[in-house]
Amino acid sequence: KRGCPAACIDLDNLDKLVPASFTEKADGVVTAAEVEQREGVSTEFARPQFTEQMRDEGWTILAPQMAPYHFELLVPIFKRAGYNVALLPSVDHGAVDAGLKYVNNDICYPSILVTGQIMEAVLSGKYDTDKLAVLITQTGGCRATNYISLIRKALKSVGLGHIPVIALSFKDLGEENPGFKVTPKMLYQAIYALQYGDLLMMCLYRTRPYEVEPGSANRLFQYWMDACKHQLERGVRQSEFRRTVRRIVEDFDALPLAGEGTKPRVGVVGEILVKFHPTANNQIVDVIEREGCEAVVPGLIEFFLFGIAGG
């Protein structure tokens, strides 16, 4: 009807997360944000740096979850280098609600989940927010580059804009954090960790659907996860890595199985975080196995090789 305010109906593309939101804006109403924008006020977020003093004082660095098996193996590498990294839980349904509270629901699901993980942890009361930093990987070309801005915006909205957000990237993003440096030695150990993670994940998913004794594959997997973490805590050598890989394969080969290879194999592909994160994919591997199939998930190393090949 002429002269009436227009109603903007915003339909979410996130299935069953939130209802459609209705917003109305009357003619002539100018928000404070629009006034600032028109006056040329900068909306850039402050960039608190993570300093060497913060590292030496043992500040907690929160790292959001993506690939539980792999990231769990990366933590000992950071701790060995003097960083007090705390990896967030792999299954956390409250993270989605927290993300929707602080991130516009038009943003993609991975961005909501990652921001939600961090905000839920920051506001949990478990950590001293005056001695807290956040670590987030940055790639480029999509929302993965926007994570850091989304997190800073969310922190600022609850009065915690002083928390440093560290961008972990091999590209020049204009971020300066003198207290956080990834050394060639750390990178070398990380390659071992990711290869261990890929191997253990593939061995587990290949054997668990056929195990004779329920839980035996998980127990063997956890044994080798603990062993690999101990190695990474003191530093892995190439000869030790080769021996460990052979022993892992031999142990899983010796696991009592029934009907190996007879079940349909179901591949899991797609966006990197959703593919690996149990909460993001609604425990898709467990669902596949409960339905009498075998899940096949490509390794995380393949993702990085794909990126390298693409230049």
Identify what each model region corresponds to.
Residues 1-311:
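An N-terminal assembly and electron-transfer interface module characteristic of large anaerobic redox
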